[in-house]
Amino acid sequence: MLFSFLQETAYAVYGLWASFYPSLYQRPLSSSTRHLDHGPDNRGYWKDGFSIKTDYEVEIPEGKLVEYFFTISEAEIAPDGYLTNVTLVNDQFPGPKIEADWGDTIRVTVYNNLTNSNGTSFHWHGIRQFQTNYLDGVPGVTQCPSKPGDTQVYEFRAMQYGTGWYHSHYSLQYTNGARGPVVIHGPSSANYDIDVEPLLITDWYHADAFSYFHEEITDHAHIPTGTLLNGKGVYECDPTKDSRCVSPPGERHTIQFEPGKKHKLRIISSASLATYKFWIDGHNFTVISTDFVPIEPYVTDILIVGVAQRYEVIVEANATFEHGSNFWIHGTHCDDMIPVPWDTRIGIIQYDAEDNSDPYTPPLETTHPGYGCRDPPPTSLVPIVPRQVGNNVNGFSPADYLEIGLQSWPNISDPDSTIRKWVLANRTQYVDWREPSLRKLVHDNGKTNFTQDEAPIVLDYETGEWVYFVIEGNFTMRDPINDPRPIPRSVHPIHLHGHDFAILAQGDGYFSKDVVPNLDNPARRDTVNLPIGGYVWIAFQINNPGTWLMHCHIAWHASAGLSLQFIEQPSKIKPLVEASGILPEMESRCKDWTEHYNKVNIPLGLVQEDSGI
């Protein structure tokens, strides 16, 4: 019944979008002035006159409905040869690939079949959810969780194209396995012959993520056991000494290359902690996309891939076979100052399907020691579709900087506290799964009556205005007695929901008013690495009413409060939610979840301890 209802209301909602945002939304083009096939020699063209030059925030192709059905469950599997309790999607890890074309409508029905009393909700990472904030999948912000036995339907338009991923946003649930790739086919800024299956890089743990939460808040971050590529890895163990060691040593993911062909790789970090150095022996990358933003191609032999970041690269199969026809795919933590006991060799490029020998391992100096954890220079990430950043409308003094730190909890003035939580902009976020922000705004008719714990920043500005934010990772103890905030060494991958942001500047040390912003078509993406001890200066345009989370995508940091939410154009939120017809379902889900939580979770002691997101 809900399926047909959503279909019936879709055009009404699109019409409402157009009435609110006539300059930002137009109906898809229906004719072409020139026809070129999208193929190996014409990847810049799509269909019906659309191309890599089309502004995808203004025009999108007509599309079809693509539909998926997900069942979320738990089981013991051994992706690296060691039995681990994993949260699965359709009995798979990683979950099934969502595949669509630019302009399609994607419908995913998610059934919670968990037996551990946990709820769930799913986020479609990088999807703007333009005017569909209620489908963003963040418990306590855009929805209540779905309780065990419940089903939720997510339906949204693929207005962007490229590579993304989906994951549970229910606390630390995705660290336990609930994640998978999203591929939205569209034009490309460089030609290629073969589109390879997406590559999910995952740092992996052998115990339940929720059991590690207390280690995180007591300054003892748990280091992953190793790395998986597309759900495969190698863990050396002895089955005679450990019954959970069932198929040692596991296996590595293998990619077949055709000599002379150009292969498109879609690299996705679905990690929870590690920022990866990623390279392939004997091959270069032509980078063509960052997150969901197509860019001017540039060539490199290594990428730093932060948690939740994505890159599309073209790799030409032109290697020399001096040491054989197999080559290692490498991935390891980027910070040499924090050694990890991982094998960098996470996969294999294979030219000859009959050759199953291990590749040659080059000398240590070829592993890019000392390369660091910095994103590619923003000047290398030039978007194909240009944007000029306008003047900021929000306050922009040092008091407005979003500073990251740790503070004692629950008493911030207690230097001897054994518990510390992350702080962003003087707040440690804690949301209430039973009373999401979006629902509160609808009930209160757009009034922003939020608590400090909900970490709101209200953006009540006109459509088209720009807002600027500096995020600093080098916070010092300005009040060391009353507000001590030590900063451990860490990259922070900062992710914004509902928008791509422009990167105006990114650097080491303290942000200074003398830093000159790049306002002329700067790099854009949805996840940026805040350098260790550095800063990043971002901007985005007001055009998408809703409650949008911004958080560090290190799962442990977000769980310990390193997040906030932007309340964008609060007065326009209720009309959009009401026009969508989603409100009765929202109310029903919150009623069911609250009853489940109060009657099941609380008596069992399975209560929310972390931020909730």
UniProtKB/Swiss-Prot annotation:
Transmembrane segments: none annotated. Keywords: Copper, Metal-binding, Oxidoreductase, Repeat. The keyword S-adenosyl-L-methionine does not apply. InterPro entries: Cu-oxidase-like_N, Cu-oxidase_2nd, Cu-oxidase_C, Cu-oxidase_fam, Cu_oxidase_CS, Cu_oxidase_Cu_BS, Cupredoxin. Residues 72-188, 198-331, 431-571 form the Plastocyanin-like domain. Pathway: Secondary metabolite biosynthesis. Its EC number is 1.-.-.-. Induction: The expression of the dibenzodioxocinones biosynthesis cluster is positively regulated by the transcription factor dibT. It is an enzyme of class 1 (oxidoreductase). GO terms for molecular function: copper ion binding; oxidoreductase activity. PROSITE patterns: MULTICOPPER_OXIDASE1, MULTICOPPER_OXIDASE2. The keyword Oxidoreductase applies. Belongs to the multicopper oxidase family. PANTHER family: MULTI-COPPER OXIDASE, OXIDOREDUCTASE TPCJ. Oxidoreductase; part of the gene cluster that mediates the biosynthesis of dibenzodioxocinones such as pestalotiollide B, a novel class of inhibitors against cholesterol ester transfer protein (CEPT). The biosynthesis initiates from condensation of acetate and malonate units catalyzed by the non-reducing PKS pks8/GME11356. Pks8/GME11356 lacks a thioesterase (TE) domain, which is important to the cyclizing of the third ring of atrochrysone carboxylic acid, and the esterase GME11355 might play the role of TE and catalyzes the cyclization reaction of the C ring. This is Oxidoreductase GME11365.
